[in-house]
Amino acid sequence: MVSLARTEGFNQKNLKDTVYHALRSIDFKPPHNIKSILIKPNLCYYWDFSTGETTDPRVVASIIDYIHEMGCGEAEIKIVESDASAMRAKHAFKMLGYDALANEKSVELVNLSDDETCEKDITVRKHRFTFTLPRSIFNCDLLINVPKLKVGPYAGGQCLHMTCALKNLFGCIPQPKKVEFHAYLNETIVAVNKLINSDLTVVDGIIALGRHPVRLGVIIAGKDNLAVDSIAARVMGYDPKRIKHLRLATEEKVGSVEHLRVVGENLRDICNLFPRRNRYRFKVSWTMQLSLLRLYARFSGDSLPSVLEKYED
């Protein structure tokens, strides 16, 4: 079951009521005896939530309040993120409002790139992966995934349809230069999700990102990342069966979309509000920009960031 909730207002009370409604609709009740909770937002860069790129801290604050009101006030709560090629979590926490949130709610901020690690092996489509992953992800009692509702980037020579629940857990990989996984991006996303199982997913679609940012006012909640992503894909105008990493996740039995039920808002009404992106135009635009950057580097003697040098046209 996946819930779809929508707010007409955008202040803290409106957002909190919408998050609560989404969680109650799926009857989410954390066990009272849990001691440690990890919350993983999407803080992929230093753009704040108004751009549609990163998780709104007010959504995370509402989740924390809900957990406390459900009788888990004694649980240790940590908000976690890892470094990326062009982002350091400690700076993102400060710039995106999470330092203030941590102080207000008395929770801890953790950079997964500084965490103790463990090695995990997994196979997807006969491709064997060995990941070095944060130990705390496996030691917590409750893992809450709080991704963004947004279209995906152009990575590793391919245009990723969407970035949501499954892709956000890819961000748990602690090494900053994740570009090395882009050659097998779909397989890597699924592999990570075979190893890391979140207990709850709350998608921040308050300001969503399609062709441009839009004040969609939507919260999607569920306990199955594949099911949540399937509904998120439909909101964005995609057929989930045509999205490679969702199709692969289904094959690898990472979650289930059989007998999927949506409660709350009318899915079609939300779909009509989302600014769909033309993937062909996006790919052409990105390829042209990259070609111009390479031309500039050739004549100026300047260098491209390593993350761009590894892309292929």
Segments from the language model and where they lie:
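N-terminal and secondary-structure boundary signal
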Residues: M1-D313
